[in-house]
Amino acid sequence: MSDMHAASREALAKVSSDLDTALKADNTVAVAAQAGTELFDVVEVLDGDRGLRVAVADSSKDAQQRVGLIGAVFGGKVSQVTLEILKDAAEQTWSTPREFRTGLVGLGRRALLRSAEMQGQLGRVEDELFRLSRILDRESQLTQLLSDRTQDSAARRDLLAKVLYGKVTSVTEALALQVIGRPEHNPIDDVAALAAAAAKLQGRSVAHVVSAVDLNDGQQQALADKLGRIYGRAMSIHSEVDTSLLGGMVIRVGDEVIDGSTSGKLERLRATFA
């Protein structure tokens, strides 16, 4: 969502803050989870009605007209918390109707992640989403099926639901099913982005670490502390094993890559003598 125009980024930041305030005031898992689910449902409605999608984000119309339309369409169909967030979103200025819709997706995700936070499960959800992204990276046939746009979104979600059943938290499942049904890029990157969003909500940036052997909890924490000192911010370690590295590890933080692997050193040595 970082590719939004400035006006939409400002609108999303404002409504995100208001959402946090509303959920904190109520402070119940059920309300946060319901808000997230209902916001996703609203997105489904907007996806199926282009006229409505344009009207609720039409910046040429008075803000109160847009708010009134939201009330007329969704009043009595969603919870009061969700309705107020929708009205708040409609009151803001968005660069395009598409970005308004994208903003609602982000708000739905945020509400579900807040529900996980209230249960003390946000770290677990982050880890589950990252692990799922790695599974999708390895299981190309599954990922291909989940990427098949010739299948409707319900079929793709049903397939993933069967894979996830009983293996992850309800929040992880809800987030993954939403992004598979309405993908932004591809299943691997979309699910990894959800994991990064969970880390960000905990005040951490993500370091993607590929090592020759599995890192234990102590090693991951030590690495997180070291990277935190280097980058000046708290870090969340998303690690996976690749034995082809022979030894050491490769660390990626944003666009920066630190290659400390044995295979990388050998490759650089070969290049020196080429």
Curated annotation (Swiss-Prot):
Superkingdom as given in the UniProt entry: Bacteria
Lineage, opening ranks: Bacteria, Bacillati, Actinomycetota, Actinomycetes, Mycobacteriales
Membrane topology: Peripheral membrane protein
Keyword Cell membrane recorded: yes
Entry's Gene Ontology cellular component terms: plasma membrane; proton-transporting ATP synthase complex
Cited PANTHER family: ATP SYNTHASE DELTA CHAIN
Organism the protein comes from: Corynebacterium efficiens (strain DSM 44549 / YS-314 / AJ 12310 / JCM 11189 / NBRC 100395)
Location(s), subcellular: Cell membrane
Gene: atpH
Name of this chain's protein: ATP synthase subunit delta
Keyword terms of this UniProt record: ATP synthesis, Cell membrane, CF(1), Hydrogen ion transport, Ion transport, Membrane, Transport
Quaternary structure and partners: F-type ATPases have 2 components, F(1) - the catalytic core - and F(0) - the membrane proton channel. F(1) has five subunits: alpha(3), beta(3), gamma(1), delta(1), epsilon(1). F(0) has three main subunits: a(1), b(2) and c(10-14). The alpha and beta chains form an alternating ring which encloses part of the gamma chain. F(1) is attached to F(0) by a central stalk formed by the gamma and epsilon chains, while a peripheral stalk is formed by the delta and b chains.
Family: Belongs to the ATPase delta chain family.
